């Protein structure tokens, strides 16, 4: 029993470290324009941090675009010269990435006043209610936070390996620094949203735990406080509202980020097929290690973002299932029964969903379709460009 407890203790410490590292890193990169008042336990929007973030991020973006070093990559030069379609697709991916970066920064800063209101309300709910209602440690929360931090590290590491690892390439260090700090900033902004979603999941998990505890007590013949059920309903409704507002703030940024991952996977998959067909022209390191690791990490990042949203949605659905346990309780008083009925009706009319742009419900079903579509796009490009896949001998 001591070994699992030790593991959970380590995971809790790692999760706390990841959250703090994200917070301090966001301050340094100018992505979190808020100061924390420890006395009032409130976040305050800082105009100085807003200005610092805009100047820093736009400067880094301009610097990352200034150097003309598209020919630093020997594989890119070889493929571009012999296959114009790959160059056109790669230019399209760069445009999508640029738009994603610009919109991410501008929209995040422009919606910061609304974001600070949401975060402050979550802080109040956590301090006044959820910290007192928690019955046990939420290990899933810790695991997801750790995995998210690990994915960020792997994404940056993967990009650096691609940049510096390809043989016979001209390295421009300051260009790499600017480019990958900009990439890190976008990853961190998306991480802010996913951390908010996983916090909402944890609060829903606490509500479900309270409802299960009440159902167990009723089965044993004990009484429960109807006002506690009313409080849980109010907390549940507040979480749904905050989730909707958070999604509205981040939906464009997260959608564009997913589109960027989607397009990068297409171009990397296409280039990998070309390298495999012309295996004698390229290093085995490139074919078997560099490009495959980039694909795997990108798919993991894409799927993990989907998993965060699906976890919150499925936990909201579990609330309705837990409330059904009260249906066969014979010893409920009328007031408790009325409160449970109100909660059940509310859950039947309103469900927690992470819906981007009012169109995309982010869950496992949608994620599976996205990944299949991603693979089909690569297959389509290979079929469309079939005659140019095999390089002609010089």
From Swiss-Prot:
It is a multi-pass membrane protein. One of its GO terms (biological process) is signal transduction. Glycans are attached at residues 44, 278. GO terms for cellular component: axon; dendrite; membrane; neuronal cell body; plasma membrane. The chain crosses the membrane at residues 17-37, 48-68, 149-169, 171-191, 257-277, 282-302, 362-382. It is found in: Cell membrane. Residues 1-16, 69-148, 192-256, 303-361 are cytoplasmic. Expressed in neurons of the terminal external chemosensory organ of larvae. It holds the Pfam family 7tm_7. GO terms for molecular function: ligand-gated monoatomic ion channel activity; taste receptor activity. Residues 38-47, 170, 278-281, 383-394 are extracellular. Keywords: Cell membrane, Glycoprotein, Membrane, Receptor, Transducer, Transmembrane, Transmembrane helix. Its main location: membrane. Probable gustatory receptor which mediates acceptance or avoidance behavior, depending on its substrates. Belongs to the insect chemoreceptor superfamily. Gustatory receptor (GR) family. Gr22e subfamily. This is Putative gustatory receptor 22a. It comes from Drosophila melanogaster (Fruit fly).
């Amino acid at each position: 029993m001591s070994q699992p407890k030790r593991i959970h203790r380590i995971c809790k410490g790692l999760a706390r470290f990841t959250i703090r590292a994200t917070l301090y890193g966001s301050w340094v990169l100018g992505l979190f324009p808020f100061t924390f008042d420890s006395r009032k336990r409130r976040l305050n929007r800082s105009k100085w941090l807003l200005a610092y973030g805009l100047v820093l991020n736009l400067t880094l973006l301009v610097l990352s675009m200034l150097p003309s070093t598209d020919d630093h990559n020997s594989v890119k030069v070889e493929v571009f010269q012999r296959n114009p379609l790959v160059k056109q697709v790669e230019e399209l991916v760069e445009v999508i990435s640029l738009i994603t970066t610009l919109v991410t920064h501008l929209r995040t800063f422009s919606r910061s006043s609304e974001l600070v209101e949401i975060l402050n309300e979550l802080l109040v709910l956590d301090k006044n209610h959820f910290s007192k209602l928690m019955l046990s440690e939420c290990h899933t929360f810790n695991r997801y936070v750790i995995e998210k931090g690990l994915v960020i590290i792997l994404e940056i590491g993967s990009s650096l390996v691609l940049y510096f690892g390809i043989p016979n390439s001209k390295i421009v260090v300051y260009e790499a620094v600017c480019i990958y700090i900009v990439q890190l900033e976008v990853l961190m902004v998306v991480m802010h949203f996913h951390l908010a979603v996983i916090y909402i999941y944890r609060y829903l998990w606490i509500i479900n735990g309270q409802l299960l505890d009440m159902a167990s007590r009723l089965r044993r013949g004990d009484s429960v406080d109807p006002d506690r059920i009313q409080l849980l309903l109010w907390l549940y409704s507040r979480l749904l509202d905050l989730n909707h507002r958070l999604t509205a703030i981040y939906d464009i940024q997260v959608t564009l980020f997913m589109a960027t991952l989607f397009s990068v996977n297409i171009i990397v998959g296409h280039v990998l097929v070309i390298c495999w067909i012309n295996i004698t022209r390229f290093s085995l390191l490139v074919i078997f290690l560099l490009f495959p690791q980039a694909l795997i990490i990108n798919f993991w990042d894409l799927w993990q973002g989907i998993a965060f949203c699906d976890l919150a949605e499925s936990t909201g659905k579990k609330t309705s299932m837990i409330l059904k346990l009260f249906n066969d309780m014979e010893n409920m008083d009328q007031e408790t029964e009325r409160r449970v009925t109100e909660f059940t009706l509310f859950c039947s009319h309103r469900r927690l969903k992470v819906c981007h742009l009012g169109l995309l419900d982010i869950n496992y079903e949608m994620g599976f379709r996205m990944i299949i579509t991603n693979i089909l796009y690569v297959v389509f490009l290979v079929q469309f460009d079939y005659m140019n896949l095999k390089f002609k001998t010089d």
